[in-house]
Amino acid sequence: MSGGQRLEGKTVVLAVTGSIAVVETVRLAHELRRRGAVVQAVMSAAACGIVHPDALTYATGREAITRCTGMVEHVLYCGEGGCADLLLVAPCTANTIGKIAHGIDDTPVTTFATTALGRGMPVVVVPAMHESMYRHPGVVENLAKLESWGIDVVPPRIEEEKAKIAGIEEIALHVERALLGRPLAGKRVVITSGACAEPVDDVRVLTTRSTGQMGRALALEAYRLGASVTVVHAGHVPCVENVHVETAGEMMEAVLAGVGKGADYYLSAAAVSDFAPARAAGKIPSGAPVEIALRPLPKVLDAVLRIFSGTVVAFKLGWDEEARAAAMLDAGVAMVVVNTPPAMGAAGGEFVLMRKDSRRTVTGTKEEVAEAIWSALL
């Protein structure tokens, strides 16, 4: 199980209810299968009125269940000893949320839910409805009740007065998190990612080619494993807290605040600026040579090591960095990940994971390398 196949060997029951968002479930089924899962669709009558069962039969490669028969499908999948590993109710209407919360099972979906909850198997609910329905006190109370039972409720996107179904990637990440054992449950992780940009003038910046792919992969892997994750960067990663910064100074401030709030891990995957120019007002005229003086900037990693007692992972970029990496290990870094410049912006590459007592070379995609890093830390 590695890279994109995090759900290999897992069976997910995709229970579909009568929200217009049911049109997204074909894509969702494909994504879960791409990640390795066996997917079995179960549909309410209302869902069948929006999307034909044949569409989900095609998307899953298994005949969609539209009614519970004498074969007791709900027990075969979600009962004691059943073959399913997780029940995913997506989309989930206000009506179905209320029925699950009160033990009512008068549709195939709610019957599967009652059975799954009685067995104690993981359940993920993905609400989708108009915003006014989502704000109804009874719906709010019912969702809180589901969460108190251990059900994972995936927050909707509030747009255009609608509580729209969460993105496909976000739903898949919640499924992975529910099925991977959560070895990082209760842990707080702070990760820096991507490039900083130091203003040269009001138009131009000094930056690097870093894309943030490694930081993103590390953050998503930590989330899958159950951690509470904060990413300090200029981009966006789903399912985590995103703290947006531009300059190295802003990153320094955000990181020190983050690790000071009880963090357990700090992973320094950003290409933090080493130098910054004095910012010129307006726009420097073009057409003539320009000399730009650069001043060195304080190191974020050094500042973290002075105040943070948790686990620190650093990254070193270069062709001959292992001697410097050894010095970083002596300074208190738990692991140094060494990679070469060609890996910057690429989908993968060769990385060396260095610890005081071990050295391991990992070659693969950045998602696979992130998995290897967290596996080594745990």
Region spans (language model):
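A cross-family phosphate/adenosyl-ligand binding-site feature
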Residues: 1-378
